[in-house]
Each structure stands twice: as structure tokens, then as C-alpha cells.
Amino acid sequence: MEEFDRSISFDGRDIRLKLGLLAPQAGGSVLIQSGDTAVLVTATKAASREGVDFLPLTVDYEERLYAAGRIPGGFLRREGRPPEKAILISRLIDRPLRPLFPHWLRDDIQVIATTLSMDEEVPPDVLAVTGASLAVILAEIPFFGPMAAVRVGLVGDDFIINPTYKEINTGDLDLVVAGSPDGVVMVEAGANQLPEQDIIEAIDFGYEAVRDLIAAQQDVMETLGVKLATLDPPPVNESVLEFIKTQTADEIKKVLSQYDLDKNGRDTALDEIKAAKVEEVIASLPEEDPIKVATTEEAKLVDTLFKDVTKKLMRSQIINEGVRVDGRQLDQVRPISCRVGLLPPRVHGSGLFCRGLTQVLSIATLGTPGDAQELADDLHPEDEKRYLHHYNFPPYSVGETRPMRSPGRREIGHGALAERAILPVLPTQQEFPYVVRVVSEVLSSNGSTSMGSVCGSTLALMDAGVPIIKPVSGAAMGLIKDGDEVRILTDIQGIEDFLGDMDFKVAGTDNGITALQMDMKITGLSMDIVAKAIEQARPARLHILDKMLSVIDSPRPELSPYAPRLLTMRIDPDMIGLVIGPGGKTVKSITEQTKTKIDIDDDGTVTISASEAEQAERAKQLIHNMTRKLNEGEVYVGRVTRIIQIGAFVEIMPGKEGMIHISQLAEGRVGKVEDELAVGDEVVVKVREIDNKGRLNLTRLGIHPDEAAAARKAAALL
């Protein structure tokens, strides 16, 4: 392909597309650039593999620190495993791409986005999403595109497209909208308790910009003479399909309307129908029977068509009767139960949230500022995280066995969503200096575990005494769309997620929304449907919130007795070196004396943590004495550190030393300093003078007994 360069003027900032310049052996490659942020996106297809019955799509987002002019840390000085942010961007690219491939496509597809250059203003993620669409089209992979994505921010009262990092961090909204010509395909957002109507307007605003980017891609395609690749669906074996319908439809309907069955009971009943009404009957057919021949040649044909029949019957029941497989109405939430303080107090806070068969146990742990997660090895401007949420999904939660491995992309993504939902209601660092980690253990899963983690996190935080601004709850909305018939489902369970068209997670407080995530299985939704889903989620969220507040209605006034006790103080930044001491000697001495942990920020904020408040107070007093301004005439108890011919040096507090001249050791003439003092002696001294260089001249003369007694008493408290 010849080189092609096109600049798109887009909302006051150019987006530049370079095609045919890099990666010539990739199926399709696009270098997409805005400002000094440039992302190379490639798409490559391989032939389908035998036995694959799903879309084998892999999306990887890669960060290189050279993009920001940096060299990686560590011994190897090379990028290691992708940071969490890179994994989340991989998912962000994947989610709007996946529904736009024909679901019958079985070719291996790999999309790789690599950030080659990055400035401090333009995030690379939405560029990568848009670039992925064009790369797939150029690779001639069947695709219902083009697709594009933009970010929407809220600065003051105005929505803006593709805000800078600074505008994102200071605004009340960080929303990514992706869309196709058919409508909205993906939404992801964090918001500062914004009303539903504001969110709807923001999505609509973003989709209008998405349409401009889609039109720009279509213009590029027309210029290059590129058309969308297509792939006809494989023929359906109508005779086998009709056989399965005839054999099972009535029985499946009975199971789907047997509302007292739980997930496991329903799955078992459906498996029994398939075995008795299909598999056993086929086994009894003559070898030459066309049904037996077809199902023998294609091993997974029965499973595939039985699932299709079940899917159509479930969807038909919802559309025509307005009743779901568990008997709920379309807008009804499953039964909810909550508990707090379930675990012993060694755990700082815990909350158990149950919704139907979904059960999530969330545990909150309070840590010190030194426990914050440093983010130095990625390209993004955030330095550290003070709130961390980790989501675990063990195999037993769905009654399965499989090897236990490190968290996968799904677990990282669900954890990040629940983390994002809570962030807007956390107290500031000044109000609550603790670093907080919440771990959500999914103990049983039947849909909406990420929103269960949001609810469990809220319960655990309040149980731990974290003064959150407002409690947060969440619900997952689903969709059944058949032509013009549309049904939106509240609080979807596993089968509705699996056989439905949408998973739209909405979290927030009674004031407004804090997080959104919408994923589709169809090629796009109109804004009317998106708006209705958001509006229908509100009463569900508030219902869930009422259930949670009936168990604990506000954060506990006291922390767990096993949580660390923190004290904060401010010192002059110029004094930081004094407190730390050479090689950390001084601060280490204080921590050892007081059995505390001390963290010092560059702005002079000192955070002291200890298991007991008295220990923290003692360390605070030591640091205060070290850093406060000394005055002439003040009396201290010190210890002799060294002796020279003309006097002795005395440390009156960690890191602060003064000298007693030989003439100030005693009344009358002193022949040798050693006649009066030895190294290690405790001595009461007065500050006689502070010279213009800040040096302390001390004396043992003229100290009243009451002054000496007060100094000894103060020293004893330390």
C-alpha cells in the first residue's frame, strides 16, 4: 500500500492518519496522532483453526517508556508485564470492536496498539480505539464498521470532546463513547455524582462527535477505494434445527416458566432435556438417517442449535409475556440481603452483599501513606493510588474447577470499574490520610458481580469507619431486542447476560451516577434506548441502596482497634533533610524508639502511623521538637556525642546538636573536658546563643533547679 496521509480537523485539534508508512507486513496498519501522542495500530488475520466455535479475537495495547523519553527501571531496564492501565486500555479497544465482527467469524484476529510517542495532554486510548477500526478495515477483515471513539469531559457547565489530562482530572466527568453507523456500541465513564440527564446528554454529545470520525474514515475508504469486507453466515442445518425444536420446545418452555428453579436447577433441567429428547433419540436413529449423519459429522451441532432454540424461547417469553425465567417483571430486582462485620475485628471492615445467587464478600484494609500504589512505570500522569479495589473470581463461584492463576483481564477490569464507582465519594487525604484497599471475593456468581462488588465495597468501607461522602450502589441492566421490539431488563442474571444483547452497569449515589460501563452484543443502540436504560437503572439503584442502609446507615464512628493510628503534621520542607538525617539515620532512630512508621511528602506533610496512639504522639513530639524554632534560654536534656579539646557536643534532640564550650561546663576553671563529661553522659543544658549560621551554643551554667526538673520531665515523656 502506498503512503497515505490525512489530517482531520476535529473539535479544535487535528487528528492525523498515516497509512502504509509503518508495519507493511501487517494486514492493516494505521499511525494515528493528535498533538505529540502517536499510536501505531495494526490488525492481522490468520486462517481459522479446526474446532474453534467462537471469535478468536486478541487485542493488546502496548506502552513503551521511550514514548515519554524515559528509560524503564529495574535491573533489565526493559518493559515487563503490562501495567494495569495498559490492560484496561486493551479492554477499552476490545469491547467496541468485538460486537462489530460477524459472530460466525472463526479466523484468528490480532489487534495490537503501540504508543510510540506521548505528550502530557492527549491520552492515547481513544486514538487507539479509532485507529483499530481503520486497521481492521484495511486488513480486509469482515467488519460492520467503521467505528470510532471519543472522550467527553465536563468543565464548568460545558461538555468538551477529548479533554486533556488536566481537564479530566479537574472536571466532573470522564466518559468514553464508542459508536458505529448503527448507534452507540460502548460507554465507559467515571462521574462525580452527575444526574442521569447530564450523563445522557454527554453520551449524545459524544456520539455526534463519533459520527464525524466515522464519516472521516468513510472518506478515507472512498479515497483509497477500500470497501468493507463481508462474510456470509454459514448455512443452518434446517432439518436438525427443526428436529430439535420439535423434540424440545415444549419442555424448554416449561423449564423457562418454572420460576422456582435457581440457576443450577434450570441448567440441570435443560441439560436433561437435551440428553433425553435430543441426544438419546439421535443415538437410536439408524446410521443412515440424515439427522444422525449431520450430528455425527459436526460434533458441536446439537449444542449450538439447542442453545439457539433456548435463546429464542427465552427472548420470546420476555418480549411477548414480559416475564423472565425467574418470574420477575422486567424492572424487578432480585432479593437482596446484606451483612457487615461478618469477620473478626482483625479485619478492619467487611461487608457481605447477596443479590439472588450472586454473593460478594468485600474486605476493607486501612494502610499508611507508604502503602499507596506507585504508578511510576506507565506513561500516564497519575503518580500513585490511595484507593485500591481488587476483584477475585475463583472457579468455585460458578461451581467449576480450573487452575488458580494470577488475575486475568476480566478480573482487573471488574476491579477497576468498582474502584471507579467509589472514588468520587472518598474523603480527601487531608480529611482521612489512610490508604484504603478493598478486596471483593466473588463467592457465588449469577450475574452482576461487578456491581455486587460496588455494593460490598460500600458496606465494607462504612464498617471500617471510612467517612465516605455518600454510599454507592450499582445495578446491571440488560436488553432483549428483536426487530423493533425492545425490552430493557433490570438486574440481569447470568442467563440473561449470556443470551441477551447488552450488559449496562450503572453505579451511583442517591445524588447521581459515579460510574458506567456498557457493552453490546449487537452493532449499535439508539440514544433513546441508551437513555431509557440509564433512567430505568435509577429506581433499582435506590432500592438496593435502601436495603444496604437498613444494615448500616453511616460509617462507624471508630476505626477497628487493629487499624493503624495515624497522625499528620506539617514541617517546613527545608527541614525534611534534617528529619531524615544522613542516610535515613535520624528518621530510623525515631521509628525504632517509638515503634512507628513515618512517611514524609515533598510538601512537608509528615504522616506517622503506629498500632497505638501514644506511640504516634511521641514520634510527633520528637519531630516537632526537631523542626520547631529554638529560642535562647530554653533548657533541654541531652546526651554527649563527642568531646573535643575546647568543649563537648550534645544532642538535645534527634538531629539537633550544640556545643558546650569548656568555659560553660562548670563554675570556675575546668582543666580538661573529660574531667566533667564523658561520651554518652546525660546532661541538662540551656541554649545560650544561636549564632547567625544557626549553630547552637549551650551552657550548663545558670540553670534553675525548676528548669532542670521541667526539662527532665519533658524528656521522660519522649
Swiss-Prot record:
This is Polyribonucleotide nucleotidyltransferase. It is an enzyme of class 2 (transferase). Belongs to the polyribonucleotide nucleotidyltransferase family. It is found in: Cytoplasm. It catalyses: RNA(n+1) + phosphate = RNA(n) + a ribonucleoside 5'-diphosphate. The keyword Cell division does not apply. Gene3D superfamilies: GHMP Kinase, N-terminal domain, K Homology domain, type 1, Nucleic acid-binding proteins. Its EC number is 2.7.7.8. Residues 633-701 form the S1 motif domain. Keywords: Cytoplasm, Magnesium, Metal-binding, Nucleotidyltransferase, RNA-binding, Transferase. It comes from Gloeothece citriformis (strain PCC 7424) (Cyanothece sp. (strain PCC 7424)). GO terms for molecular function: 3'-5'-RNA exonuclease activity; magnesium ion binding; polyribonucleotide nucleotidyltransferase activity; RNA binding. The gene is pnp. Involved in mRNA degradation. Catalyzes the phosphorolysis of single-stranded polyribonucleotides processively in the 3'- to 5'-direction. Residues 564-623 form the KH domain. One of its GO terms (cellular component) is cytosol.
